[in-house]
């Protein structure tokens, strides 16, 4: 019975504490990481799809197709480089907890891997004639 009373008192104290104004910042961080992760997943699917198109391009050598592929790769590359800059700046913040820091580092590492694959594919497209 004493345990239940102590637990109820603890819950009442926790509910009475003022809400931190930082919650918005942490929710925004969570939303940004989720959005970037979803976009990285879309870019990964795009890379898989476009790899087949690059194989066809190497066989045909169509210049219009080459220009289109380069434009699409450039847009994805710009998104990843922009997100890398954002995540690097956010990692310098001192108010990050362990989970947020891990999420930012994971998103940064995922972006780096995708950027490496994008650049390799871009080089393949540029070298095809």
UniProtKB/Swiss-Prot annotation:
Consequence of substituting residue 105 to A: Over 20% reduction in IgE-binding. Further reduction in IgE-binding. Most significant reduction in IgE-binding
Outcome recorded upon mutating residue 77 to A: Over 20% reduction in IgE-binding
Leader sequence residues: 1-16
Phenotype upon changing residue 95 to A: Over 20% reduction in IgE-binding. Further reduction in IgE-binding. Most significant reduction in IgE-binding
Coiled coil: none
Matching InterPro entries: Mite_allergen_group-5/21, Mite_allergen_group-5/21_sf
Outcome reported for the amino acid change (mutating residue 45 to A): Over 20% reduction in IgE-binding
Entry annotated with the keyword Signal: yes
Tissue: Midgut and hindgut contents as well as fecal pellets (at protein level).
Annotated phenotype, changing residue 53 to A: Over 20% reduction in IgE-binding
Keywords: Allergen, Signal
GO function terms (MF aspect): IgE binding; protein homodimerization activity
Similarity comment: Belongs to the mite group 5 allergen family.
Assembly and oligomerization: May exist as homodimer and homotrimer.
Protein name: Mite allergen Blo t 21
Protein species of origin: Blomia tropicalis (Mite)
């Amino acid at each position: 019975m004493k345990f239940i009373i102590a637990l109820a008192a603890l819950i009442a104290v926790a509910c009475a504490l003022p809400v931190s104004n930082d919650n918005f910042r942490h929710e925004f961080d969570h939303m940004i990481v989720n959005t970037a992760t979803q976009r990285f997943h879309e870019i990964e699917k795009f890379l898989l799809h476009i790899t087949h198109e690059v194989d066809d391009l190497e066989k045909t050598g169509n210049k219009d197709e080459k220009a289109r592929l380069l434009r699409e790769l450039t847009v994805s590359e710009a998104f990843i480089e922009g997100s890398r800059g954002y995540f690097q700046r956010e990692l310098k913040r001192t108010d990050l907890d362990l989970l947020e820091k891990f999420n930012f580092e994971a998103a940064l590492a995922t972006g780096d891997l995708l950027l490496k694959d994008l650049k390799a594919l871009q080089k393949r497209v540029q070298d095809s004639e």
